Design a protein with these regions (language model features):
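FIC/Doc superfamily catalytic core
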Residues: 1-175, 179-243
Length: 243
C-alpha cells in the first residue's frame, strides 16, 4: 500500500498548485473525515451531516450537549495541527499538553494525573502517578527518534503506531487519553507531509486493538488503517484534479 501512496503523491505533485476552491474543499473533506472517525472511536453516534451542521453553527436536535462541544474541540485541534505542521513544528512534549488542552478544555499546563487509574473497557491498570515522569521521558525519546524517520518508509507508519501506543500506555491525564494518542499520531504524520487521518474503525474493533497493544506491548497493525485513510484521501484528490 505504501508503494501506491508514493505513486499518488508523485502524481499530485505534478498537478500543484491546486485552484484555491479545490484546496479548500480538500481541507474541508479532510477535517470532516478526521473529526468523524475520531468521534466514532469515542463512542459518538453523530453523522457526518450532523457534524457539518455543528461546524456551520446549527446544533442538531436530540443530541447530548457534550457532542457539539467535542466537535468544536476537534475542529480547533485540527486547525491547530494544520497551522503547526505548515510551520514545520516537530512533535514534542509541550504539544502533548497543548493538544490535551484543546480536546478537554483544561488548562494547557495541567499536571499529569495524581491518582491511580483503572480503565475498565480496556481492562488496564495505568502506570502509577509516581511512574509518569519516567514514562513521559520515554515518550519524549520517541518523539526525538521520530524526527529522523523517513516519511516514505514503513518505519514512518510503525513510528506513528508507536507514538499512539505509548500515549495509550502512559495515560498521562486520565481523560481523553485515547483521543490524545490519536491526535499526536495524526500530527506526527501531518508533519511528515501526509493528510490528517484517524483510523476508520468501529469502536469495538479499536478497543480490541488497544487491549492487545496493552497486553503485548507490540504493534497491532494500526498503521495499516492509517495508510488506508491516507490513500483514500489521495485518491479523492487525484480524481478531482484530473484534467
Amino acid at each position: 500500500m505504501l508503494r501506491t501512496i508514493k505513486k499518488r503523491i508523485i502524481m499530485l505533485g505534478n498537478r500543484v498548485p491546486f485552484a484555491p476552491e479545490k484546496q479548500k474543499y480538500f481541507e474541508d473533506v479532510e477535517r470532516l473525515q478526521w473529526i468523524y472517525n475520531n468521534l466514532v472511536l469515542e463512542g459518538s453516534s453523530l453523522t457526518k451531516h450532523q457534524i457539518q451542521d455543528v461546524m456551520e453553527g446549527t446544533i442538531p436536535q436530540n443530541v447530548a450537549i457534550e457532542e457539539p462541544i467535542m466537535v468544536e474541540a476537534l475542529r480547533s485541534a485540527f486547525d491547530e495541527m494544520y497551522f503547526l505542521a505548515e510551520k514545520g513544528v516537530k512533535p514534542c512534549m509541550e504539544m502533548v499538553g497543548y493538544f490535551n488542552h484543546l480536546i478537554t478544555g483544561y488548562d494547557r499546563d495541567i499536571p499529569y494525573r495524581k491518582t491511580s487509574l483503572m480503565v475498565h473497557h480496556w481492562d488496564y491498570v495505568a502506570p502509577h502517578p509516581a511512574e509518569l515522569p519516567e514514562k513521559m521521558t520515554e515518550l519524549d525519546s520517541l518523539f526525538k527518534e521520530a524526527e529522523g524517520v523517513d516519511a516514505m518508509s514503513e518505519a514512518c507508519f510503525e513510528m506513528a503506531e508507536k507514538i499512539h501506543n505509548k500515549v495509550i500506555e502512559v495515560m498521562p491525564y486520565g481523560e481523553k487519553d485515547g483521543l490524545l494518542a490519536r491526535v499526536m499520531t495524526s500530527y506526527f504524520l501531518m508533519e511528515k507531509g501526509y493528510p490528517a487521518v484517524a483510523p476508520d474503525m468501529k469502536e469495538q474493533e479499536y478497543n480490541e486493538t488497544v487491549i492487545k497493544v496493552l497486553k503485548t506491548r507490540e504493534l497491532q497493525g494500526l498503521g495499516e488503517f492509517l495508510k488506508k485513510e491516507i490513500l483514500e484521501h489521495l485518491d479523492l484528490m487525484i480524481q478531482l484534479t484530473a484534467h
